[in-house]
């Protein structure tokens, strides 16, 4: 016997379906579901009197060895940079995405996908009405505090690349012994990690020994001297070893100007950190590098989005971060040269155009670990308010093109740049089951569940002595996947191919799986999903700092109010 449900009644029971729109948090962004994989009337739902019972939505007698899922997250709305915006069931086996589609019991339900069979060995975290996104990546982290890992997970970030300590300011771990210690320390946390070595050396041997010790990439920082010779040496070694090079260029233009750095890079792939320049880099024109295919640009979150407070906050942050003395005029001039309202205003617009491809934190060296995802969506909201719908969204009553552009900035694009997109960055089948589940009203700021390697590691959770999980205070807390040996089974440490082939994990006693980065030297701007725009003509006026693209002034007004802010964090 069938029953016809109104669209509203269906949504209350099973969540939104094809053609429905969801508002993301308290932003102005609307996501429209492009496809629903479900079979109406045969939805897999867990609970008393629901369908996920033996012989109904759960196939009797089917073992995990025979193909039953380990986990199913049913009836989720998926927002993914590759898959788009869909509704479906997410199946997990052996810590990986088994598929997205229709899950259930093929004996009793129509349309069940072969790889999404629910059996007695299948567990669930009901995702009805929730939004699922890939675990976020932050590939610009200063590992100065061990609490960063908890803040990352609580915000939806499951992969962390960076370095420590480097004076606390340079995003690199210096020397083979220090790299090994950081790799060992990271075993304590249920995240994917990778550590950058110091690439500032005019000779190759010190760089090579760090790569062989387990570094996943190289970092060039002006505080260690980002000279043309250093840049050339690091890139030469990186090309031989297949690791990425990240660069913080010379703010003071002491060892050369932007043109000299460009010449030293010589067409080779490089990740340009905080490309706007407030975080550091050739003043005032480092932003011009976004116009080249081999330059892979990212922003750091302190300057995103541009608000009425951005300029004043940054000046003090630069002084502290780079050990500058406010009583020394030259130090003050150094800080002031980096903070330019005009280029910060242009940064928002260039993100919205898809010319800046990634968002990162720069945690504890001006940026905030837990705000990568939040500030990405605040920027998307601000740009819709100020620039209107993107051309691809006009006439759709939704913002799908803009949403895909922005979610790619902290998922698939940094995964490609880091050389780990085979493993993370999207919810494509075969990748790690790093999944973040959000209630739509809390999207972008407070995840409901964080799944790492197919197992819950963090979630909203009430008082442990309460009668229910919902007993106040409900707050972000660790789950069982974050403790014991489970955290090793669900996490991955990324190292260079040389270190992987030399069994660095066994050498230093790592229990987490170790995998090599690869393909870092062939990636270009054209590979940046939804963010591949490379302006042919971008100019920064050396006097006014105004930014022009193809002769048109690129700017925006500072925001006085933002979504995903005090309303959620009182």
Swiss-Prot record:
Carboxylation allows a single lysine to coordinate two nickel ions. It is found in: Cytoplasm. Ni(2+) 2 binds at residues 219, 248, 274. Ni(2+) 1 binds at residues 140, 142, 219, 362. The modification N6-carboxylysine is found at residue 219. The active site is at 322 (proton donor). It catalyses: urea + 2 H2O + H(+) = hydrogencarbonate + 2 NH4(+). Pathway: Nitrogen metabolism; urea degradation; CO(2) and NH(3) from urea (urease route): step 1/1. Its EC number is 3.5.1.5. GO terms for molecular function: nickel cation binding; urease activity. Binds 2 nickel ions per subunit. SUPFAM superfamilies: Composite domain of metallo-dependent hydrolases (SSF51338), Metallo-dependent hydrolases (SSF51556). Its cofactor is Ni cation. One of its GO terms (cellular component) is cytoplasm. GO terms for biological process: urea catabolic process. It is an enzyme of class 3 (hydrolase). Residues 135-570 form the Urease domain. Gene3D superfamilies: Metal-dependent hydrolases, Urease, subunit C, domain 1. InterPro entries: Amidohydro-rel (IPR006680), Metal-dep_hydrolase_composite (IPR011059), Metal_Hydrolase (IPR032466), Urease_alpha_N_dom (IPR011612), Urease_alpha_subunit (IPR050112), Urease_AS (IPR017950), Urease_asu (IPR005848), Urease_asu_c (IPR017951). Belongs to the metallo-dependent hydrolases superfamily. Urease alpha subunit family. This is Urease subunit alpha. It comes from Haloquadratum walsbyi (strain DSM 16790 / HBSQ001).
